[in-house]
Amino acid sequence: MSSDSMRNIRNFSIIAHVDHGKSTLADRIIQLCGGLQAREMEAQVLDSNPIERERGITIKAQSVSLPYLAKDGQTYHLNFIDTPGHVDFSYEVSRSLAACEGALLVVDAAQGVEAQSVANCYTAVEQGLEVVPVINKIDLPTADIERAKAEIEAVIGIDAADAVPVSAKTGLNVQDVLEAIVHRIPPPKPRDTDKLQALIIDSWFDNYLGVVSLVRVMQGEIKAGDKLQVMSTGRNHQVDNVGVFTPKRKVLPALRAGEVGWVTASIKDVHGAPVGDTLTLAADPAPKPLPGFQEMQPRVFAGLFPVDAEDYPDLREALDKLRLNDAALRFEPESSEAMGFGFRCGFLGMLHMEIVQERLEREYNLDLISTAPTVVYEVLKTDGTIINMDNPAKLPPVNHVEEIREPIIRANVLTPEEYIGNIIKLCEEKRGSQIGINYLGSQVQISYELPMAEVVLDFFDKLKSVSRGYASLDYHFVRFDAGPFVRVDVLINGDKVDALSLIVHRSHADRRGRELCDKMKDLIPRQQFDVAIQAAVGSQIIARTTVKAMRKNVLAKCYGGDVSRKKKLLEKQKEGKKRMKQVGRVEIPQEAFLAVLQMDNK
């Protein structure tokens, strides 16, 4: 395809931290370009998932194609790919950026630059994108445009002299943003081959259409009736329809080079069009696939079990469909003595885990129990083999373990100066070691290496509370480090409950064991017999507590009378309780499994 026909195409996405007004700016751009009538407009048009709306965050990448009549009299085709801002979804961002030539960096004029925008902006610069800074929320009384510009230059290191000040809420200067997109972001470059290459940015399952793929056509064109080949699997599929989102789904005769749109090809197998794959024509395939994306490795694992065992096949199907839409989700079947059959699932972080569980419960009407999340440990066995362990119950016997290594992450925290003390104290409590502190204008960047197990549970919430919500966090995995780790098991009446096991640092084992026993005592209902709750490391019991039995007052019918008669009745009751304890089983409520999560939140 000639560079002439691509000259008026602009592919861009928006990079911003959570809550800096990215979705609102997208709404204004859609409105200005006439994508939707005023009566059809609603807040957060592209956040179509109800969970996205409620939490006010973007989870999935969405795309929209808009015609824009610029001041120079030419009509440009703007393809906008929405990106999430939360650290757990950074892989979604890199996928969206791979399909663009430019990005808008949106910074809140009142809050300044935050850590997640920095990380995503570096990704954009590495991929060679043109970054256009936009300073949003200038209608706020606390807005300080000059400070925001200075921070963009100091923290990110890109020139902010031509940053566009806007208010997405009132629509002020949004036209200037569109002009900046047209004049500063380059058009797509033609490739050296004319054979079809299209990158799959995203896929989702539609009950009527099968798999719908969002693609960026790099070279060639796709039209209905073409036979496409998925390059990684070698399978062929016939195209039913192609088109774009405006944001409504609109069918087009063909998608040409440089364009972003959707393709349906009646693919019923949910693994038929993997994200990051390349589509080409079966009759005339491209010599090699496009460079895809990095595979994201899940960092947090948890068991998901259906409350009703009959829902197991439905849970498998729901996870399959969700996996298509969420490339970072991993799962494999797992069985637990306490919970029955379910799946061990891998997530990118706690927010990712919460959202997957919420989507399964809402979109697929499943009732689920989740076990406490754990991170992946590396275990060096005495015979020299190394295994990756994502479930504490699978730790080999102590005499077979040479050492246990935990994952370490590098965390970058951006915070206003006055909260440095609180944040350093929090990081030290979490066994962190400081790498460095940089003063950047009024902001401070603190770098720490922290054990991932400490970060996964509640570090993000605590960071927000010690900094009154001003600090922001970005982290990435660095390496595995050996340490003195032990597995704490929970025994209830002498039976080990595998779903409650956890791996902890030896120095914390006694405290965690005591806390867990006390928590269990509050949550396990009283039975007709004593229930012993113990925490053990190997064969050594480190904590114990007892849920006392409920007793009937067997002396109620004795008015006065001989003491030996009373003793006889009490002894008889005692014998009965003893027999009951041998055969009785304790039902453990769901709250008890979640207790492991809330132990640090006291």
Curated annotation (Swiss-Prot):
One GO location term (cellular component): plasma membrane
Binding-site list for GTP: 19-24, 136-139
Membrane topology designation: Peripheral membrane protein
Class of enzymatic activity (EC top level): hydrolase
EC number: 3.6.5.n1
Gene Ontology MF annotations: GTP binding; GTPase activity; guanosine tetraphosphate binding; ribosome binding; translation elongation factor activity
Catalytic activity: GTP + H2O = GDP + phosphate + H(+)
Intracellular or extracellular location(s): Cell inner membrane
Keyword Hydrolase set for record: yes
Keywords tagged on the record: Cell inner membrane, Cell membrane, GTP-binding, Hydrolase, Membrane, Nucleotide-binding, Protein biosynthesis
Gene3D superfamilies: 3.30.70.240, Elongation factor 4, C-terminal domain, Elongation Factor G (Translational Gtpase), domain 3, P-loop containing nucleotide triphosphate hydrolases, Translation factors
SUPFAM superfamilies hit by this protein: EF-G C-terminal domain-like, P-loop containing nucleoside triphosphate hydrolases
Gene Ontology terms describing biological process: positive regulation of translation
Major localisation: membrane
InterPro entries attached to this UniProt entry: EF-4, EFG_III/V, EFG_V-like, EFTu-like_2, G_TR_CS, LepA_C_sf, LepA_CTD, LepA_IV
Domain tr-type G: 7-189
Key word Cell wall biogenesis/degradation present: no
Assigned protein family: Belongs to the TRAFAC class translation factor GTPase superfamily. Classic translation factor GTPase family. LepA subfamily.
UniProt xrefs under PANTHER family: TRANSLATION FACTOR GUF1 HOMOLOG, CHLOROPLASTIC (PTHR43512:SF4), TRANSLATION FACTOR GUF1-RELATED (PTHR43512)
Role noted for this protein: Required for accurate and efficient protein synthesis under certain stress conditions. May act as a fidelity factor of the translation reaction, by catalyzing a one-codon backward translocation of tRNAs on improperly translocated ribosomes. Back-translocation proceeds from a post-translocation (POST) complex to a pre-translocation (PRE) complex, thus giving elongation factor G a second chance to translocate the tRNAs correctly. Binds to ribosomes in a GTP-dependent manner.
Descriptive protein name: Elongation factor 4
Species assigned in the record: Stenotrophomonas maltophilia (strain R551-3)
Chain's gene name: lepA
